[in-house]
Amino acid sequence: MTALFAGLTTLDVLHRLDHVPDPGLKVTSTDFTMAAGGPATNAAVTYAALEAGARSLSTDEAVAGSPDPATRADAPLLLTALGEGPVSAFMAADLAVAGVRVLDATTPAPTVTSIPGLPGSAASSLAEAAAPTIHPTPADERDAAQASAPREPAVSSIIEHPSGRMVASTNARLDTDPARVAADLPERVGVVLIDGHNPALAQAALTLGVPEVGGEDPFARLEARPPHLRVLDGGSWKDWLTPLLGFVDVAVVSEDFAPPLLARADGEQVAGFLRGFGITRVVRTRGERPVQYWWDGAHGEVPVHEVPNASTMGAGDAFHGAFVWALERAGATDPERLIRFASAVAGVSVSSFGTRQWLTSPVLAELVRAW
């Protein structure tokens, strides 16, 4: 059994500074790293690291090992859009090393064969040689340029400094076609997580394993649940989430998650809003403040241990990946245990710069062993 993650993959380019930068000056970074990132992607990488740690507890696995962790049947699946070109190839290689299997649902570039008057198009065939000359319009040339342009992935540039960080990102910009990889999706998974950055990918992931229903009842498919739990990573509200919420079983949201009907992101109101869609299990992270939860009628808070000199890039993603890993193993009966484990893993993630160094921390291995 494994987990399915669906959502955004970006190239994360991270710089660290030892001072707050002056916007008018060029500065030299004190540290630098580059890796595949994005909410669902970082969560999948976290899950893979925890899974590798669990396998290492077995003597046989530790001795035998695996030459390619991404080919293992229990490696997490990432349904995403990597795009084309050298940047995409780098991200694919990075994720393979991290032990993540990728299902790339990028829509292929359209051909230009249907654009009249352009070289290589149907209009330039011998059969139409005698036809009147059709001169391409600027719109035709623009369409041809777009068709031939590589499908480049999203890129995020992050500068981390003592007072915080600055992020510039293209966000999701690739068209996706989940049907292209539908045959590669497993029949069963242990748990699903979506980050909501691409509604088509989210829809495909959330409806995986949902039994077919007949009749004219519009709510029948919402009530026909799969055997696994489906988790929403709600970093922020996205307008296309509304029709998807009925397929979600657990929502893990940040304090920035504010549905448009609410005047402000109040935790109780957010939980009530989600409850209206049938989501009775809500976890709300708030940085260094205690994590709140509303779980099948119960409500509480779980303290978060402060980490000095924290590098918080990807901390929320690590929390989500660890939460999913624990949820798959322990089920949904004890939310505080799930939150404590996920918070501890997130605490390890902020103890070093970037989104990869911490994965080999002995503290992480001890958390897996204690679990």
Where are each of the predicted segments found?
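Short acidic active-site motifs
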Residues: 177-181, 201, 239-241, 269-270
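Positively charged, low-complexity intrinsically disordered leader regions
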Residues: 1-23
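Conserved phosphate-binding/catalytic region of the ribokinase-like
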Residues: 266-371
